[in-house]
Amino acid sequence: IDWKKLLDAAKQIL
């Protein structure tokens, strides 16, 4: 799992 990608996605959602 790409945590960096997940963090980026969460940032976009926020």
From Swiss-Prot:
<dbReference type="GO" id="GO:0045087">
    <property type="term" value="P:innate immune response"/>
</dbReference>
<dbReference type="GO" id="GO:0006935">
    <property type="term" value="P:chemotaxis"/>
</dbReference>
<dbReference type="GO" id="GO:0050921">
    <property type="term" value="P:positive regulation of chemotaxis"/>
</dbReference>
<protein>
    <recommendedName>
        <fullName>Polybia-mastoparan-I</fullName>
    </recommendedName>
</protein>
<dbReference type="GO" id="GO:0005576">
    <property type="term" value="C:extracellular region"/>
</dbReference>
<keyword id="KW-0145">Chemotaxis</keyword>
<dbReference type="GO" id="GO:0016020">
    <property type="term" value="C:membrane"/>
</dbReference>
<keyword id="KW-0964">Secreted</keyword>
<keyword id="KW-0399">Innate immunity</keyword>
<feature type="modified residue" description="Leucine amide">
    <location>
        <position position="14"/>
    </location>
</feature>
<dbReference type="GO" id="GO:0050830">
    <property type="term" value="P:defense response to Gram-positive bacterium"/>
</dbReference>
<keyword id="KW-0929">Antimicrobial</keyword>
<keyword id="KW-0472">Membrane</keyword>
<comment type="similarity">
    <text>Belongs to the MCD family. Mastoparan subfamily.</text>
</comment>
<keyword id="KW-1053">Target membrane</keyword>
<dbReference type="GO" id="GO:0050829">
    <property type="term" value="P:defense response to Gram-negative bacterium"/>
</dbReference>
<keyword id="KW-0044">Antibiotic</keyword>
<comment type="function">
    <text>Antimicrobial and chemotactic peptide for polymorphonucleated leukocytes (PMNL). Potent antimicrobial peptide against Gram-positive bacteria B.subtilis CCT 2576 (MIC=4 ug/ml), and S.aureus ATCC 6538 (MIC=15 ug/ml) and Gram-negative bacteria E.coli ATCC 25922 (MIC=8 ug/ml) and P.aeruginosa ATCC 15422 (MIC=8 ug/ml). Has low cytotoxicity to normal (non-cancer) cells. Exhibits preferential interaction with anionic lipid vesicles over zwitterionic ones, which is further impaired by the presence of cholesterol.</text>
</comment>
<keyword id="KW-0391">Immunity</keyword>
<dbReference type="GO" id="GO:0044218">
    <property type="term" value="C:other organism cell membrane"/>
</dbReference>
<keyword id="KW-1052">Target cell membrane</keyword>
<keyword id="KW-0027">Amidation</keyword>
